[in-house]
Amino acid sequence: MKTPLFLLLVVLASLLGLALSQDRNDTEWIQSQKDREKWCRLNLGPYLGGRCRK
Protein backbone atom coordinates (compact mmCIF):
# COMPACT_ATOMS: atom_id res chain seq x y z
CA MET A 1 0.00 0.00 0.00
CA LYS A 2 2.86 2.40 0.69
CA THR A 3 4.53 1.94 -2.70
CA PRO A 4 1.68 3.34 -4.90
CA LEU A 5 1.27 6.31 -2.58
CA PHE A 6 5.00 7.01 -2.68
CA LEU A 7 5.04 6.80 -6.48
CA LEU A 8 2.08 9.16 -6.68
CA LEU A 9 3.85 11.67 -4.46
CA VAL A 10 7.02 11.44 -6.57
CA VAL A 11 5.07 12.02 -9.78
CA LEU A 12 3.17 14.98 -8.33
CA ALA A 13 6.37 16.53 -7.00
CA SER A 14 8.08 16.21 -10.38
CA LEU A 15 5.10 17.78 -12.16
CA LEU A 16 5.10 20.65 -9.70
CA GLY A 17 8.80 21.14 -10.31
CA LEU A 18 8.23 21.29 -14.06
CA ALA A 19 5.44 23.82 -13.64
CA LEU A 20 7.54 26.05 -11.41
CA SER A 21 10.61 25.85 -13.63
CA GLN A 22 8.86 27.25 -16.70
CA ASP A 23 10.52 30.39 -18.03
CA ARG A 24 7.66 32.84 -18.28
CA ASN A 25 9.80 35.36 -20.15
CA ASP A 26 10.39 32.90 -22.97
CA THR A 27 8.91 34.19 -26.24
CA GLU A 28 7.40 30.78 -27.07
CA TRP A 29 5.63 30.66 -23.69
CA ILE A 30 4.30 34.21 -24.11
CA GLN A 31 3.05 33.40 -27.62
CA SER A 32 1.35 30.21 -26.43
CA GLN A 33 -0.39 32.19 -23.66
CA LYS A 34 -1.63 34.74 -26.22
CA ASP A 35 -2.86 31.96 -28.49
CA ARG A 36 -4.62 30.26 -25.58
CA GLU A 37 -6.34 33.50 -24.53
CA LYS A 38 -7.38 34.18 -28.13
CA TRP A 39 -8.84 30.67 -28.43
CA CYS A 40 -10.61 31.11 -25.11
CA ARG A 41 -12.16 34.43 -26.13
CA LEU A 42 -13.37 32.95 -29.41
CA ASN A 43 -14.70 29.67 -28.05
CA LEU A 44 -15.44 30.02 -24.35
CA GLY A 45 -15.85 33.76 -23.84
CA PRO A 46 -19.62 33.94 -24.38
CA TYR A 47 -20.20 31.10 -21.93
CA LEU A 48 -18.02 32.62 -19.22
CA GLY A 49 -19.39 36.12 -19.58
CA GLY A 50 -16.36 37.21 -21.61
CA ARG A 51 -13.88 36.13 -18.93
CA CYS A 52 -11.15 33.68 -19.85
CA ARG A 53 -8.53 34.24 -17.18
CA LYS A 54 -8.62 32.95 -13.64
UniProtKB/Swiss-Prot annotation:
<feature type="modified residue" description="Pyrrolidone carboxylic acid">
    <location>
        <position position="22"/>
    </location>
</feature>
<dbReference type="GO" id="GO:0007621">
    <property type="term" value="P:negative regulation of female receptivity"/>
</dbReference>
<keyword id="KW-0085">Behavior</keyword>
<dbReference type="GO" id="GO:0045434">
    <property type="term" value="P:negative regulation of female receptivity, post-mating"/>
</dbReference>
<keyword id="KW-1015">Disulfide bond</keyword>
<dbReference type="InterPro" id="IPR012608">
    <property type="entry name" value="Sex_peptide"/>
</dbReference>
<keyword id="KW-0325">Glycoprotein</keyword>
<dbReference type="GO" id="GO:0019953">
    <property type="term" value="P:sexual reproduction"/>
</dbReference>
<keyword id="KW-0964">Secreted</keyword>
<dbReference type="GO" id="GO:0001664">
    <property type="term" value="F:G protein-coupled receptor binding"/>
</dbReference>
<feature type="signal peptide">
    <location>
        <begin position="1"/>
        <end position="21"/>
    </location>
</feature>
<dbReference type="GO" id="GO:0046662">
    <property type="term" value="P:regulation of egg-laying behavior"/>
</dbReference>
<dbReference type="GO" id="GO:0007186">
    <property type="term" value="P:G protein-coupled receptor signaling pathway"/>
</dbReference>
<dbReference type="Pfam" id="PF08138">
    <property type="entry name" value="Sex_peptide"/>
</dbReference>
<feature type="propeptide">
    <location>
        <begin position="53"/>
        <end position="54"/>
    </location>
</feature>
<feature type="disulfide bond">
    <location>
        <begin position="40"/>
        <end position="52"/>
    </location>
</feature>
<dbReference type="GO" id="GO:0018991">
    <property type="term" value="P:egg-laying behavior"/>
</dbReference>
<dbReference type="GO" id="GO:0005179">
    <property type="term" value="F:hormone activity"/>
</dbReference>
<comment type="function">
    <text>Induces post-mating responses; increased oviposition and reduced receptivity.</text>
</comment>
<protein>
    <recommendedName>
        <fullName>Ductus ejaculatorius peptide 99B</fullName>
    </recommendedName>
</protein>
<keyword id="KW-0873">Pyrrolidone carboxylic acid</keyword>
<feature type="glycosylation site" description="N-linked (GlcNAc...) asparagine">
    <location>
        <position position="25"/>
    </location>
</feature>
<comment type="similarity">
    <text>To paragonial peptide B.</text>
</comment>
<dbReference type="GO" id="GO:0005615">
    <property type="term" value="C:extracellular space"/>
</dbReference>
<keyword id="KW-0732">Signal</keyword>
